[in-house]
């Protein structure tokens, strides 16, 4: 059965408990459900294969079970593994201490970004399909970088570290 990852925007241990989130997806009929880290990453199996349909089903399950709404971006584990194998950062020299991040877009509308783009300690490097690959060196200005991503791509996005993507693929 195909395996998927739901990346939820805005989830933290303060606003969503992972056992409750897991239960919501199981109640909706998803199988082999696992949460990864406490920031809204859920891995699951589903016969349904259209990611947009899975996004709506996950969001409906969370609203029904928790009374909360979180934007959800779903990708197949196979797709994420290919993305990891591609290593979109390999063509760039990264500063020491750089954090690699992936911004998952909910839709594939055209975006006019002049890349690579650098601001303070952050660089937007490459847009491949629906994903934006960036790096930043953690600093007090890091939240400004997240605001720049939102300004460039809109609010229908969620961002994860490269390490988190590796963890969900292995889950």
Model-inferred region functions:
Residues 2-39, 43-171:
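Surface-exposed, charge/polar-rich loops and edge strands
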